[in-house]
Amino acid sequence: MAVSEMSVADKSAGPYGIATGPEGALWLTFAHSGRIARLTLDGELDAYSLEPPGCRPTVIAPGPDGALWFTRSQDHRIGRITVDGETESFPVPTPDSGPFGITAGPDGAMWFTEMNTDRIGRITRGGEITEFVLPCTGAYPSAITAGPDGALWFTLNQANAIGRITVHGDIVIHPLPTPSAAPVGITSDGSALWFVEIAAGQIGRISVDGAVEEFPLPDRAAKPHAIVAVSTGDCWFTAWGSNSIGRITGSGKIAEYSLPSPSSEPHGITQGPDGALWAALETGGVARIEP
């Protein structure tokens, strides 16, 4: 297993989210400096400044329109950037919403979470936003992904649950067995949903009918944060507490790989166009893991 790192910014920039674009490059959010960066596989980097710099771009995801969409958690907007670097943004109707997770839905729209206001949002290519109120308060909806069942699935960090919403807005909440697990990242492997429990040091799996399994990490203080599936029963995750990248199989077998630089704060993770795993390091770099 080869693990390497590349510097993409100084420590004040805060690389956070990462996604693979439709043109074969990697796209990152620089949460602390208000920029979106494009990184090619040969190391060429372009950075695009956002206004205001304190907008805090957070999670980024490819859209069905060939652009990248991202949340701006500090100024409560949804951003869009083309592969040529042209940006625009749209305000979330509910004030102080704190958008965080974002993903392409099965309906041609982007779906996102509102951490501060217990809502799930939907935005069209033209910027029209619809919001759906969750049946719980103080839930802190975090990451969101499209499920294999045509619905959207999301973590409720403070409600200790996984939520499901259909494209029509019907919502079901599935409580987790472990108290105060604080789920964050979530991904679909095409069969089930996998998620991380940052406070419990576990990886979870939930079937589309709501059956939950949990797998403890060797280091329960590992603080798993983001997770991505590369195939059915093969997921990779970041663990910033243990400064590592982990892998879990469908049977729950876990392997962890230490990052070269200490305390590098890995957050977002994606499968790159080269088949490797790429993680954003908040201290200013990206890590590449060749399986």
Which residue stretches match the model-derived regions?
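A short helix->beta-strand "capping" segment at the edge of beta-propeller domains
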Residues: 1-12
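Beta-rich, blade/repeat-based domains predominating
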Residues: 10-23, 53-64, 94-107, 136-149, ...
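A short loop-to-beta-strand structural motif that recurs across blades of beta-propeller domains
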Residues: 35-37, 76-79, 118-121, 161-163, ...
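Short loop/turn segments that connect beta-strands within beta-propeller blades
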Residues: 40-43, 82-85, 123-128, 165-170, ...
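Solenoidal tandem-repeat scaffolds enriched in leucines and small polar residues
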Residues: 111-118, 125-173
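Eukaryotic tandem repeat interaction scaffolds
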Residues: 157-164, 170-232
